[in-house]
Amino acid sequence: MKIAHINNTSGIASIIAKEQKKQGHEVDIFVFNKIIHSQFGGNMINYKSPFARWNLFKKIKEYEVWHYHYPYGSLKRSLEKRNKDKVYLKHYHGGDLRGKYDNDFCLVSTPDLLKYSPNGKWLPTPIDIGEMKGEIFSSPERNETIQEDRCHLRIAHYPYYENFPSTDYYSKTLLTLAHEKKCEIVEILRLPHIQALKAVNSCDIVIGKILPDVGWFGKFELEGMALGKPVIAYVSDELYKVYKPPIYRTTKESFKKDLENLLEDISERQRLGKEGSGYIRNFHSVESVTKIVQESYNLLHTMN
């Protein structure tokens, strides 16, 4: 098949496309954001340029499949005017669907989005486990079992809330614990993807998102789990009962206490690290995710 991935949210299209190419498909990725392009690659399109837009719509006519990541705004409207006879797969990633509604068959990247898409299917975020097994991601030469002082523990933290200070449930706690020399905070921000993975791999704990209105987590947390790191994050009771991810669960109210407990509990960290990497292999492998994607293409093809 000739497949166009439109957008590349969190590099997910890149991971899927790599596996699709192995299977013999002809695949291209079109991106519209310079940061995403610098991190994950793809064909950069200046969507503000009328000529670039015209050229994009002309180019993608050649593809059988339009796999559209983060369907939103004027691009979504323009594609839907032109998608006749195409396998047009909408793949939602969060704010593009949350609080809205889509009755079509589609894919969603987190299970909380299923409430907004009654005919949707959850596609677990693919994690390139093979990439992480490379030499540069091997575990640092540090033996946690002989560490008696918690100040040696490094905590990976992605301050995603930088532009939304009202959702910063972390900084006060992290500054306090660092000042008390209970841990070292490693901010994962504005790094090329490979460097970000290396930084996470040098840490002992990954702090994930606390999103009470969402109740789930994203690729950053999954990559930490794939690297064998214990992850602390918020997972709603509703979603935990169904999916039971190996996450050290916390809330915005209990975050400080929960993080201190995790810092103190070596056996729990080891358990979560082991179970987390197994969880990724079982549910987030590139092969299993790409199989679901192909089944989705086939389903939409029969519906055309």
Model-derived features with residue positions:
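Active-site proximal beta-strand in glycosyltransferases
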Residues: 65-67, 81-99, 104-109, 121-126
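A charged, aromatic-enriched C-terminal amphipathic alpha-helix characteristic of glycosyltransferases
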Residues: 264-298
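Conserved catalytic-core segment of nucleotide-activated headgroup transferases in glycan assembly
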Residues: 128-196
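Short His-centered aromatic/hydrophobic patch
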Residues: 68-74
